[in-house]
Amino acid sequence: MVDVGDKTTTRRRAVAAGTFHTTTKVIDLLRESALPKGDVLATARIAGIMAAKRTDALIPLCHQLALSAVDVDFTVADDHIDILATVETAGKTGVEMEALTAVAIAGLTL
């Protein structure tokens, strides 16, 4: 793991995006709140946030970070759902991996 001990603590922010492709039928069910597993967007949002907080356990050689904010947002279109994760911290290393992990796990949860 890279030694970041001598780096200066600064505000850090990363944004990652992804797209979940599906059918119009699934999107219609989602919009009607008729999916059998309930509110999938809320579940995927929570999964993405939890994943960002656990990135160091999921990705080898990632530093454990105290995150100050994690937001996972969705934009629902006719045949896909766009996922946008924003992660912030005040630390010695960036939060890019945490943002990417949030998007990946939110997408898998969908």
Where are these regions (language model features)?
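C-terminal binding/interaction regions
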Residues: 1-41, 46-63, 68-109
